[in-house]
């Protein structure tokens, strides 16, 4: 199981993501603070920041941007993925400062990508929903879905594969084509319970078990 960081370190990263976005929306400046955790400056994992709007008891994606294979170090990747999620996701208008009180920040730390080199028909047997994220690549096309996505949608491995292909702007069955490369990875995910509130580490295996009941 990929868990490189403590809850204290994960909490720092989520707080950092929110703080740099608030600073950027207030002043237009991006500031990379110092870290009391040396690992965050030496590790170079992939990082994604996700921002979700709260609507009653439901959450709606507001922005998600990241670096699948890292950017300088975990600290820098968190800072710039947070700015990307708030203001550079082409699917959404830029986040407004007044929205900060009604959005949740989530930071996902990605393990190195692992290329699957088996018969594509065996992919559904290998992929574990609640553990794996997927990356599909073929020619100039690529698509990534984080491990929490199939859990939140309660997808089967086959549905997860199909939607990752679609994310790459490829046919839904592209994963069966041997010209398509499929990578799996794991992620450690830290999330706010409420806007600016307590941070916890998500347990996707338990979440997926609940969705199947």
Curated annotation (Swiss-Prot):
Q: Which residues form the AMMECR1 domain?
A: 8-201
Q: Give the matching InterPro entries.
A: AMMECR1, AMMECR1_dom_sf, AMMECR1_domain, AMMECR1_N, AmmeMemoSam_A, Uncharacterised_MJ0810
Q: Which domain of life is it from?
A: Archaea
Q: Which residues form a coiled coil?
A: none
Q: Which PANTHER family does this chain map to? A: AMME SYNDROME CANDIDATE GENE 1 PROTEIN, AMMECR1 HOMOLOG
Q: NCBIfam families annotated for this entry?
A: AmmeMemoSam_A (TIGR04335), TIGR00296 family protein (TIGR00296)
Q: What is this protein called?
A: Protein PAE0745
